[in-house]
Design a protein with these regions (language model features):
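Cyclophilin-like peptidyl-prolyl cis-trans isomerases
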Residues: 1-153
Length: 153
């Protein structure tokens, strides 16, 4: 049974298949936070067309996290369109922030960010979020919120 996450956003639903075999600590962390309701009501605080959408910061600024960090998990997954990866502030600084890639290829990020899932439904929603009006810091003018639930199968 595959582990999936349903990310209900204010713009529609994104379904993600997670990669527990390739990034076990990262998937455990994401599923734990989701199960605790950590992501519920948070926003995508950084959206860049043809690059990615980023969320998971409790402050909504890109500066916050869960109060701890954990190490990177390198794997064979490319950082390309539809991939779910951890955002960080450098090596081994993963917490709660993540991004979903909208560009065809971002492999210059490979080895710098742990890939731990991919979009299996709702890539059109990801693209729509990445193209909302935003300010000079790439924050949407109108907040795009999320709720994350973990489902099996």
């Amino acid at each position: 049974m595959a582990t999936k996450a349903e990310m209900e956003t204010s713009m529609g639903t994104i379904v993600l298949e997670l990669f527990p075999e390739d990034a076990p600590k990262t998937v455990d962390n994401f599923t734990k936070l989701a199960g605790e309701g950590y992501y519920d009501g948070l926003i995508f605080h950084r959206v860049i067309p043809d690059f990615m959408i980023q969320g998971g910061c409790p402050q909504g600024t890109g500066t916050g996290g869960p109060g701890y960090t954990f190490e990177d998990e390198q794997n064979a997954h490319n950082v390309d369109r539809g991939k779910l990866a951890m955002a960080n502030a450098g090596p081994n600084t993963n917490g709660s922030q993540f991004f979903i890639v909208t560009a065809a290829d971002c492999n210059w990020l490979k080895g710098k960010h742990t890939v731990f899932g991919e979009v299996v439904e709702g890539m059109d929603i990801v693209d729509a979020i990445s193209n909302v009006d935003r300010d000079g810091r790439d924050m949407p003018h109108e907040p795009v919120t999320m709720t994350v639930r973990i489902v099996e199968g």
